[in-house]
UniProtKB/Swiss-Prot annotation:
This is Small ribosomal subunit protein bS6. Residues 96-135 are annotated as: Disordered. Residues 105-135 have a biased composition (Basic and acidic residues). Transmembrane segments: none annotated. Keywords: Ribonucleoprotein, Ribosomal protein, RNA-binding, rRNA-binding. GO terms for cellular component: cytosolic small ribosomal subunit. GO terms for biological process: translation. InterPro entries: Ribosomal_bS6, Ribosomal_bS6_sf, Ribosomal_S6_plastid/chlpt, Transl_elong_EF1B/ribsomal_bS6. One of its GO terms (molecular function) is structural constituent of ribosome. Belongs to the bacterial ribosomal protein bS6 family. Binds together with bS18 to 16S ribosomal RNA.
Amino acid sequence: MSLYEHVFIARQDLSNAQAEGLIEHFSTVLADNGGKVVDREYWGVKTMAYKINKNRKGHYAFLKSDAPSAAVQEMERLMRLHDDVMRVLTIKVDKHAEGPSIQMQKRDERERGDRGDRSDRGDRGDRGDRGGFRR
């Protein structure tokens, strides 16, 4: 079996639960056809660079799978027929990256709010004279 990564975009008017239901549905399709989902991530609603089917935003989902090509083709066929799925991208990879995807790492950094460049400021004595008003 081969390793694949899939990203799909669902319509923006779906609820989060419905979007995650789509992830579960397509994972089941892979499993029914002899494959397995190694990892799945729901990236949330993101703004797209251009409109797709009159939608400016969409629910993004990411799947890592280990499946035969027939299972992947069947899942892609069903995704393209599904009214709620706007775009599908599947790539074959040599191996899956460990840990969360780059998108999830970015989200974690953003939610944490921890700025690494703030701890070394101290009392900000490195600013020097800023040409303040003097009499």
